[in-house]
Amino acid sequence: MSRPERIDCVLFDCDGVLIDSEPIAARRNVVVFGRMGIPATFEDCLTMCGQDGKTTIPAIGAKYGIDVTAEQFFAAKRECIDAGAIEAVSYRMPEADTLPGVHGVLRRLRAAGVLTGLVSTTVSSHILVGLDRFELAPMFDCIVTGDMVERHKPDPMPYQTAMDYLHVDPAHTVVVEDSPAGVRSGLAAGCYVLGFRGSATVRQDVSAANEVLDSYFDFDLA
């Protein structure tokens, strides 16, 4: 697929695309697995980035010969939060920050009249914390979170939901994603997908994307 001649809308994932939060989330998940007696590594937990955990959590447990469901993991996570072992929302951590160039790209897109949206698997209560802390909320015309859709990435529903709300055609929509599941979701929705590799810590396989973006300073769509 070639890049759209006219771009009406750009839809962004959040974690690892707007906010460099994935390393923080992975470290938190190491603690949770440890509470369950599973010696998961930081690298193991990075495989959970961009996904809802229904397949990745059992896979991590299986690696160490332990059966575990996503429901059991999230119950243990709640116990860790209640015990003060981990912060409930990664966006509150001092080391959390936006990726370099994020605010500038969003301002340029909006100045050019391009609609912008945030499409994330993360639940809305957490996303709102990040948007508020980093002053991102006013920069989006649409926000779709994990608790707003029945099916998550790699299913196309999250991106289709955003495009339906904004009344835009996928042929004129660009998606920015940093995970294999997110890339597949954007492609399945019929969009042109940029595979973002701008995080210094986490670089997932985005080779299936239509184009790879290494930095927002190279972002030339607007």
Predicted regions and their residues:
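Asp-based, Mg2+/Mn2+-dependent phosphohydrolase catalytic module
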Residues: 1-10, 103-110, 114, 123-222
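An amphipathic alpha-helix signature
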Residues: 26, 30, 53-58, 124, ...
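Short beta->alpha linker loops
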Residues: 24, 48, 52, 97-101, ...
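Conserved G/P- and acidic residue-centered "switch" motifs that form tight phosphate/ATP-binding loops
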Residues: 13, 17, 120, 178
